[in-house]
Amino acid sequence: MRLRITNSVTHLTSSLLFHLQKRRKLFSTLCALWFCLLGQGLLAQPMLFTNARIIVGDGSVIEQGAMLVDGESIVAIGDAGELSSAENGTTFDLSGKTLIPGLIDAHAHIGYQGRNGWGAENYTQENLIDNLQQYAYYGFVAVFSAGSDAPGLAIEVQSRLALQQFQGARLLYAAGMAPPGQGPNNQFLDQALAVEKSTGANILWGLENPEQARAAVREVAAQDFEFIKLWVDDRGGSQQKLAPSLYEAVIEAARSAGLRVFIHQQFAEDMPDLITAGAHGFLHGRIGSSLNAAIAEQLSQSNVFVIPNLGLGELRSEAIGADRFLGQVLSSELRSQLLLGANRRELSVSRSPQLEAEQRESFAALIDAGVDIVLGTDAGAIPNHHFGYTGHRELEIFVRLGMSPMQALQAATSKAANHLQLDDLGLLQSGYSADFVILDANPLEDIRNTRSIMDVYLKGKPVDRAVLQQQWQGQ
């Protein structure tokens, strides 16, 4: 359901129409300017959202709160009754609702999953935008695409988003580095190499020796990359594992250039040396018996984050097409592929009690040590691991393994924003971007209530989720 408001610009618009009808050229010009200004939010009214439960994102809650938005920014937040809307502003009574900061997916691979299939042929500007719109539909306001993007196309999409030509999650992307011609899982590797060929872009940077690795870092820094993603994984013996001398050279050069380095590592046992080398974070937690208290303490002392990334394994065998929450964005063709019986998926997937216990113990070690656990999904790295939806499922896994709902929400908001250096996202505080989600139910009571999305706002503007849903289901 969309919030209904009475827009006070209506009276002003009517007056303009009355006085300018006989001056058609001037009328057309002013109308174009008027709607441009409206589109850019320059004529937006202040909005007061009041009587809501406000989950700030830093672990605190305002049970009966209010938030004032002016243009693209949050300008005040506090107890209901203490804030009032500016003159000519609009007030929304959100009694019984919950406000949360917009969510962030800190590990994905956009562009390859399309409306009716997965692969390199989908990697177009239009599909990148579609993926970012799907993230926004599910309440995600930013996504980090980890080392599989053609930078030219990514920059074009970023520019269009900055110009507000569409509403979608913010896009961050990285230069991917690994031994030559290697890195992603073998299925995904073929698709990334195909995109390299079709676009002429350098997506996967092959590392051969330390000096060449340092030169590669200098080159990506000159191209204004902010992140590097390293693969340190032999893929079960099918690829060459990146040598310590190479990842040490990359991390050292990246730190000198002001770039952040995130790691796909094969085992938890790889983590100590990578932490010592200066890695900023791990895109796979390798949660289990090998990720013990000693590694957790080293992570904490070095302020290195961990993305558990557990849904990638759990959901690939589940009949997710039967989940109505995902069905909202699926084409009829794709829905039929994902229903019970298709691809040998099951409605209920049994989990190993031993593995579950090991993961719970590993999670507890990370939490007790104060490690920043961050939400990431690896969405898009394999077929039908869907954007946005998988983030909500990952939150459910976090809570199942021992996090509180509040801790899980912080992993998807303030902690993700901090490690991605998104200084205006992740919190509902004055001065931050007005990127937030209105929920019909309280996620602190049940984390699955993050699914109860009433509205999503990006830069102070509501996302038209109904139009997006109709568009996607019709494909």
Q: Where are the regions a protein language model picked out?
A:
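Boundary at the C-terminal end of the N-terminal hydrophobic targeting segment
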Residues: 44-46
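His/Asp/Glu-enriched, well-ordered alpha-helical/loop segment
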Residues: 256, 343-442, 462
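Histidine/acidic-residue-rich catalytic or RNA/ligand-binding cores of hydrolases
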Residues: 114-117, 241, 271-277, 312, ...
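Divalent-metal coordination cores built from histidine and acidic residues
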Residues: 94, 98-99, 103-116, 121-233, ...
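N-terminal secretory signal peptides that target proteins for export/translocation
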Residues: 1-23
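C-terminal cap of metal-dependent C-N hydrolases
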Residues: 52, 412-414, 433-474
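Histidine-rich, glycine-flanked metal-binding segment
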Residues: 54, 58-100
